[in-house]
Amino acid sequence: MTETTITTSDNVEKYGEREIRDAQLITFPNPRPGRRYDVHITLPEFTCKCPFSGYPDFATLYLTYCPDQKVVELKSIKLYINSYRDRHIPHEEVTNQILDDFVAVANPLYARLKADFNPRGNVHTVIEVEYHQEKAS
């Protein structure tokens, strides 16, 4: 049996770090644009940092949307969400920013994002934001 040795260097960017750094939300054409349906995505490992203390904040994100012409590619949303890991950002801002970025690329008929942050210091925070596409007159 051959032994494999893996060496790492602290100053070399890892491929996962590069993917996260370059992450962008990617969409593809909705395979059923004439049918209204909901997509539910759960992201249980969201992290960012408190802008005041620097402590990590952990949350489960629940994204529900009704696609119009585009659907978001799942790996891209995973990498995009992971890009917040080292950012110092308040719960309210990060929840709104994620929904704004999602809407900008996917242009859904409807989207709702719920960010359920783990309790810290006996405080449990849940932020919910929504978007509804305006109808053309």
Curated annotation (Swiss-Prot):
The parts of the chain that form a coiled coil are none
Source organism's superkingdom?
A: Bacteria
* Any one of the GO CC terms: cytosol
The EC number(s) attached to this protein equal 1.7.1.13
Spell out the protein name for this chain: NADPH-dependent 7-cyano-7-deazaguanine reductase
The record's active-site residues are 50 (thioimide intermediate), 57 (proton donor)
Q: What class of enzyme is it?
A: oxidoreductase
Listed under catalytic activity are:
7-aminomethyl-7-carbaguanine + 2 NADP(+) = 7-cyano-7-deazaguanine + 2 NADPH + 3 H(+)
Keyword list (alphabetical) reads: Cytoplasm, NADP, Oxidoreductase, Queuosine biosynthesis
Q: Read off the HAMAP family from this record.
A: QueF_type1
Instruction: One Pfam family, please name it.
Output: QueF
From which residue to which does the signal peptide run?
none
What is its biological role? Catalyzes the NADPH-dependent reduction of 7-cyano-7-deazaguanine (preQ0) to 7-aminomethyl-7-deazaguanine (preQ1).
Similarity comment text for this entry = Belongs to the GTP cyclohydrolase I family. QueF type 1 subfamily.
Binding positions (substrate): 72-74, 91-92
Check the record and name the Gene3D superfamilies matching this protein. Answer: 3.30.1130.10
* Gene Ontology biological process terms from the UniProt entry: queuosine biosynthetic process; tRNA modification
From the Swiss-Prot or TrEMBL record, state where the protein is found.
Cytoplasm
Give the pathway.
Answer: tRNA modification; tRNA-queuosine biosynthesis
What organism does this protein naturally occur in? Synechocystis sp. (strain ATCC 27184 / PCC 6803 / Kazusa)
- NCBIfam families named among the record's database cross-references: QueF-II
Classify the main location: cytoplasm
Q: Name one GO molecular function term.
A: preQ1 synthase activity
